Regions:
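Pyridoxal 5′-phosphate
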Residues: 1-421
Length: 421
């Protein structure tokens, strides 16, 4: 394969892309040369939908014109504004609308879920996590363990790849569950790992955990909006995710949470950290002293959600509904496969792709461990308008996103690498 061959293939693929028009619905940053950048960083922060500004401004105008009455007299009343998101989020994560809610931020939601679902006993107090869990997850988990009077060093069990592999296999996680079942209170895994890009089998891990009465929860920060999910059918107990990566809600925007209906509608409500926005909607404003949770995931809400953050998220979710996860996933597999083909074919000595090669075991991201002059290659990419990110000590992450990336973006990335290697 040559660069010329790659350009020809990319041109053909872009011409035949049935989702190409969606790119025009996003604000693409410009490079210093005036051209669009090749933005391969949607795994860190998604781009702004062109409609986001107008959607936020509509709510600003409503605030200016209505004041507090916007909660009830607005065309989209603020008191129920978050309910607009349930159907969209349910489709994206594979849930019932009442099993999902947009609220808080990811780590806050994780704390709320751990408060309700991590119920250690003297015998079963350990938590199984993945080898490269995002640090905030480990911080939250360790603090929850300490609050229960246990030692995190003893209570956290880490699933690590086999010596010959850099990624974690689902079967290895299942084997650890079987081995430590009598000690485990919770399995907490990433749907897609932020560092390696590896994807685990949520259904298989949940089934293995439930065989032994172990709770199964998931961090979907790098999975929601990236890969198809079926949380309800897979019987996951809970899940949390952010909306600022693949779901394009803006930096630090409101996050998402899933609670399976068997918990959200249990006859005896699960213990939780409670707040007034999770109280029964029909009696919330009676300001009674006793908490009555809304059935479903909404019952874990604390305060009324940040309205402007929600407004910025809505246009992206509408684009997901328009495109459909199946079509987006098909394009995603094609983009990432094209990127991998180019990297392996043109630069076999440049670096090691540590993300699994099988499409079913990854999302859109490729993580490349660069074997020499890694930082120089990264600096060259960014300097030439290829926006990606760096993870210590030597990994470059590239994530072509089907909503707004073209195959031509991958060609630009490869062209820069050909000059920098």
């Amino acid at each position: 394969m040559t660069l010329a061959d790659l350009r020809t293939q990319a041109d053909e693929l872009d011409r035949n892309d049935s989702l190409a028009h969606l790119r025009d619905r996003f604000c693409i940053p410009r490079h210093t040369d005036g051209a669009d950048v090749a933005y391969l960083c949607g795994n860190s922060l998604g781009l702004a939908p062109t409609a986001a500004r107008e959607c936020v401004e509509q709510e600003l105008v409503a605030w200016e014109q209505l004041g507090v009455e916007g909660h009830f007299k607005h065309e989209r009343p603020w008191v129920s504004f978050h309910e607009l998101f349930a159907k969209h989020l349910a489709e994206i994560v594979g849930a019932k609308p009442y099993e999902v809610v947009a609220m808080n931020t990811l780590t806050v939601n994780l704390h709320l879920m751990l408060t309700s679902f991590y119920r250690p006993t003297h015998e079963r107090f350990k938590v199984l996590v993945g080898h490269a869990a995002f640090p905030s997850d480990r911080y939250a988990l360790a603090s929850q363990i300490e609050l229960r009077g246990h030692n995190p060093e003893e209570a956290i069990l880490t699933a690590k790849p086999l010596a010959a592999s850099r990624v974690l296999r689902t079967e290895d996680v299942v084997a650890l569950i079987e081995q430590h079942a009598s000690e485990l209170a919770l399995v907490l895994m990433d749907g897609v790992n932020y560092y390696t890009g590896e994807r685990i089998d949520i259904a298989a891990i949940t089934e293995a955990a439930h065989r032994h009465g172990i709770v199964a929860g998931f961090d979907l920060a790098h999975a929601a909006g990236n890969v198809p999910l079926a949380l309800h059918d897979w019987n996951a107990d809970f899940a949390v995710w952010c909306h600022y990566k693949y779901l394009n809600g803006g930096p630090g925007c409101v996050a998402g949470c899933f609670v399976h209906e068997r918990h959200g509608f249990a006859r005896e409500p699960r213990a939780r950290m409670a707040g007034w926005w999770g109280h029964d909607k029909h009696s919330r404003f009676k300001m009674g002293p006793d908490f009555e949770p809304i059935p479903g995931a909404e019952g874990w809400q604390l305060s009324n959600p940040p309205l402007f953050s929600l407004a910025a998220l809505l246009p992206s979710l509408e684009l997901f509904a328009e495109a459909g996860m199946d079509r987006l996933r098909a394009k995603s597999e094609a983009l990432t496969g094209f990127l991998e083909l180019a990297i392996r074919g043109l630069f076999p000595e440049w670096g090691e792709v540590i993300t699994p090669a099988e499409p079913a075991r990854r999302g859109c991201q490729l993580s490349i461990r660069v074997t020499r002059d890694a930082k120089r290659a990264f600096v060259a990419l960014v300097a030439n308008g290829v926006i990606c990110d760096w993870r210590e000590p030597d990994v470059i992450r590239l994530a072509p996103v089907p909503l707004y990336n073209r195959f031509a973006d991958i060609v630009r990335c490869v062209e820069v690498l050909s000059c920098a290697k």
